Each structure stands twice: as structure tokens, then as C-alpha cells.
Curated annotation (Swiss-Prot):
Keywords: Chromosome, Developmental protein, Differentiation, DNA condensation, DNA-binding, Nucleosome core, Nucleus, Phosphoprotein, Spermatogenesis. Testis. Residues 15-41, 66-102 are annotated as: Disordered. This is Protamine-2. Disulfide bonds: none annotated. Protamines substitute for histones in the chromatin of sperm during the haploid phase of spermatogenesis. They compact sperm DNA into a highly condensed, stable and inactive complex. It comes from Pongo pygmaeus (Bornean orangutan). InterPro entries: PRM2. Interacts with TDRP. It is found in: Nucleus; Chromosome.
Length: 102
């Protein structure tokens, strides 16, 4: 399957190269279509489906890490504000409430 796809891609590149020799405008137009066409994107994802899976996995990990970092930073801010302002405990409590909402 991979060999067939590679052959088709090489044949297309030769066709585009021939069109550039005959007419440059047509060649550029075809190249733009090849770069942006959704059909080729689907073919690329089929031939290399593992790349799509990796993207999902990475995004999940990144989102999880970002979420954890936000929580940690929130806790650090709470502790720092509590230690810094021991006299003003009312302000600290309101900050905790806003932190829990996020």
C-alpha cells in the first residue's frame, strides 16, 4: 500500500513539472490545490494514521499538565497571600472562593 501511494505521488509531481514547462500559471494553480486540498490530507492521514493518534495523545497530556499547573499556581498564591496578609483574613477567604470557581 505504501509503495502504491509513493508511486502516485511521484507521478503527480512529474505531471505538475510538465505543466510548469507548458504554462507556469497552471502549474502554480495545481500546486496550490495539491497543498490545500482536503482529499490529499485524508490520503496522508490514511497512509500515516499513527501521526493523527499521536496528536490526540499529546494534546490530552498537554491539557492535563496545563490544568495541573493552574491548580498549583492557585494554591501557591493562596498560601503566599495568607502568609503575607495574616491580619486581613477576610480578603484571603474571598480569594479562596474565586480560586475554587476556576
Amino acid at each position: 500500500m505504501v509503495r502504491y501511494c509513493v508511486r502516485s505521488l511521484s507521478e503527480r509531481s512529474h505531471e505538475v513539472y510538465g505543466q510548469q514547462l507548458h504554462g507556469q500559471e497552471q502549474g502554480h494553480h495545481d500546486q496550490e490545490e495539491q497543498g490545500l486540498s482536503p482529499e490529499q490530507v485524508e490520503v496522508y492521514e490514511r497512509t500515516q494514521g499513527h501521526s493523527h493518534y499521536r496528536r490526540r495523545h499529546c494534546s490530552r497530556r498537554r491539557l492535563h499538565r496545563i490544568h495541573r499547573q493552574q491548580h498549583r499556581s492557585c494554591k501557591r498564591r493562596r498560601r503566599h497571600s495568607c502568609r503575607h496578609r495574616r491580619k486581613h483574613r477576610r480578603g484571603c477567604r474571598t480569594r479562596r472562593r474565586t480560586c475554587r470557581r476556576h
